[in-house]
Amino acid sequence: MLFRSARRSPGDFEGVRSVAATVERPTVAALARTVQDDLDAAAEALAGARRSRIHVFIATSPVHMERKLGLEPSEVLRQARGAVAYAAERVDEVEFSCEDATRSDPEFVARVCRAAIEAGAAVVNLPDTVGWAMPHEYAGFLAEVRRRCPELRRVVLSAHCHDDLGLAVANSLAAVQVGAGQVECTVNGIGERAGNASLEEIAVALKLKRDYFDAETRIETEHIAAASRLVSRLTGYVVQPNKAVVGANAFAHEAGIHQDGMLKDERTYQIIDPKDVGVRMTLPLGKHSGRHAFARACADLGMKLTPDELNAAFRRFKALADTSGAVPVEDVFVEVTA
């Protein structure tokens, strides 16, 4: 779990402290700059955690070092080493991130990673902070940094991707392919700007493609839909209907050809078992629906129709659906009995 932690944000501080005192199995992490006040606040907030982690970060790209931090690379290197060592004395483990890694020089990133590992970092995170990389570029970047810094093989390599180009999940999965043991993601993909990699999409992809990725998680995916709804309600961020895995339409089949196939065998148009993510498959009725789905809806409503009655009712339904789009199932009963 990742939270911003600094004294200038009392709400974040209390949030971290509350989570740390409540959860039992997960490692609780607080995010901190390479600033002693941040590090002290993070350690204090994590005091009640069963297992605590401070996540230290500093930018390594030229534009960030020059324009945002006003620091020379040598000073960035010094701060990274010092902050990790300081944090390692106060919590169970330390994670270190090179902010804006994908726009950084791989050789410099390797040097900073080596310094962080030598100072005590157990997890090293190489973020695509602005969603700049393509999947093959991100995988290649991680592999190149690890080639230049063999010490990375002694720690957990982590991926953190943003969705500015809609590639956060693809990039995260590409990272898993080249050995990332941790992927940072969020429920519903919420996050800065266009968001972060979507937890539900990554979890289900790794579950379905376990042999392909040779990786697995301990996520209980049957609770994913409930978690998505809870996060949506608490944040006010509406989940788009066509969102993969958790969108309202993710397991809804309206097209007649698809509905016919689904009624015969759900594997025809569905690669994810809805029960695996805590939802049900639906066959909504609309102008693209076919006779088989309509007949199924009538049967589900307890109506017993002769072939002629079914044909007449289906014609009335299609006329209604052609003008109104989706047709609630209760309206089918009205149309049939009219």
What are these regions (language model features)?
Residues 136, 143-149, 173-174, 193-204, ...:
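Metal-centered catalytic cores of metalloenzymes
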Residues 204, 210-338:
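A mid-to-C-terminal "edge-of-domain" accessory segment
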Residues 157-164, 171, 185:
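Histidine-centered catalytic micro-motifs
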Residues 5-8, 31-34, 58-61, 99-101, ...:
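Short, ordered loop/turn segments at secondary-structure junctions
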Residues 20-27, 46, 50, 54, ...:
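Structural signal for hydrophobic packing residues in well-ordered secondary-structure cores
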Residues 50-51, 167-183, 190-208, 250-273:
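Flexible glycine/proline-rich, aromatic-decorated loop/lid segments
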Residues 14-23, 36-157, 173-180:
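Alpha/beta enzyme core
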